[in-house]
Structure formats: C-alpha cells, structure tokens
C-alpha cells in the first residue's frame, strides 16, 4: 500500500467522500449518484486502505499544502456509453506518446492518469 500512497499523495488534511448510503438516481443518465462531500480530517493510511478494500469511497486532493501536484486524472464520461469509442483515446495516447495511463472506470468511461516523479 505504501506505493499507492506515494503516487496518490496530495493534501493530507482533508479529502472527499462519496457517500452511497443516500445515493440518488440521475434522471438523465440513469446512473446512481452518491452524496459527495468534503471532510476536514487527516487523510491517513487507514483511509487509503479502507478505499482500496471498498469500505469507503474517497478522493484525494491532488495538490499539497504548497499547491504542487504529483498526479492528475481526467475523467471521461460520455453521455451515451453504447457508442463510446475508447479505442480512439487509446490510439491517440499512443500516437502522440502521451504520458497518460488509461483505466476503464466503473461506469464504462475512462480515467486518464498522469503521474509526476516528485512535487
């Protein structure tokens, strides 16, 4: 887990929470939508662990106390998933040798990650 904390390191004095207990359904997309909120508690290694095991759904603030970022992510969620062409994005990343790591999201979209060696 230390490797995960190292690459997803950012602001450690607060983090985002996606609370699924009172989730609503988005009428436009039909997708479940959690109650998003911000908590001003320490983002501890245990919180990371709870996220990785699925106990909590949290989000790290990528910028640290100095406003520097070590990672970033672009979240691509198309309006219509049926005709979503992931291959276009994958080929574009390869064609231009972009330093992005594409991961399919739970919804079927894409998350494009960018990592820096240091702040």
Predicted segment positions?
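DNA replication initiation on ssDNA origins
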Residues: 1-71, 79-89
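Helical (often loop-to-helix) elements that flank the catalytic cores of nucleotide-handling enzymes
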Residues: 82-95, 115-119
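Histidine-centered divalent-metal-coordination microenvironment in nucleic-acid enzymes
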Residues: 74, 99-119
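Short glycine/proline-enriched loop/turn "hinge" motifs that connect secondary-structure elements
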Residues: 61-67, 94, 101-106
């Amino acid at each position: 887990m230390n490797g995960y904390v190292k690459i997803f390191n950012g602001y450690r004095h607060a983090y985002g929470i996606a609370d699924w207990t009172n989730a609503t359904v988005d009428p436009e997309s039909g997708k479940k939508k959690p109650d998003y909120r911000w908590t001003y508690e320490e983002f501890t290694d245990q919180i990371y662990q709870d996220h990785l095991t699925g106990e909590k759904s949290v989000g790290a603030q990528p910028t640290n106390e100095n406003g520097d970022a070590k990672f970033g992510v672009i979240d691509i969620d198309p309006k219509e998933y049926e005709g979503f062409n992931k291959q276009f994005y994958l080929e574009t990343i390869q064609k231009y040798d972009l330093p992005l790591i594409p991961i399919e999201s739970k919804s079927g979209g894409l998350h494009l990650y960018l990592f820096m060696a240091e702040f």
